[in-house]
Amino acid sequence: MKALLKKIFQNKKISSDKDLKFLDLKNNKGVNKIFGAINNYNETSEIRYVGGCVRKILNDEKTDDIDLATNLTPDQVKQCLDKNQIKFFETGIEHGTITAVIDDQNFEITTLRKDVKTDGRHAVVEYTTNWKEDSLRRDFSINSIYSDLDGNLYDPNSGHKDLNVGIIKFIGDPETRIKEDYLRIIRYLRFYTEYSKIDHEINIIKIIKKNIEGLGKISKERQFNELKKILKLDNFLKLFNNKTSCELFSLIFPQLKNFKKLSKLSKPQEKILKNKSLNFVISFLVIDETDNSDYFAVSYTHLTLPTKWTV
């Protein structure tokens, strides 16, 4: 009984921001089934939305993936799902992640973790029941916001505030976080492009440049996946209108040497570009003057552009 009361009042203490933006998710059959299964496991069991799922809801974006965190171990999660006849896969069991499937929708459920050691690519983790510890291993404050089913936030790193004012803030020491996983260099550029409302911090840029060669430890597949996420942003052209962002982009992806042309596109041309396929955008970035990129742009789109991209 004592543990149950602690669970109830702990939630009230750490979360005072009920947000109606979570109402649509609350009405999701799968969400309710999973929250019920985990929360009813024992007196101390908890599950919350986390990461990009919360960030997007708070920013009025469409939520594609539902990421969940729990203080139960993976084995306990599997017991909960089995008991409630919920299908699941051990997709990331080595990282503490179980993927539940309800009505063809995936729900990633990950046990709270803390880092033990890392080599700049992958971290060795151990499970914890401490939400604060789990938050401290995440990359940016805007990705360390948790929410219960009703939209009550647990925000130990002030990520909601940073999201509102447009600050991309590393959790803890930026250089330490980058060295834990060098892919965070590209992730920084992506989140800065998508959410930032202020200029880059000089110190952050210095640290990124100092550690840029660490990306050599990251597989090309992981790097390319981040590039695709950047180019799929609704406002990805914002990146090419910022001098510092352009400099970082050229250091990270030197092959995409034609990116400077994107900063000179007219509004109609920008609109056309955003409607093109990802392959087209990447091809346009790769082809340089010797390959006649203007001709390629028109030819590839079967003359749907009103004029050649003479920029």
Protein language model regions, located:
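Catalytic cores of the polymerase beta-like nucleotidyltransferase superfamily
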Residues: 1-303, 308-311
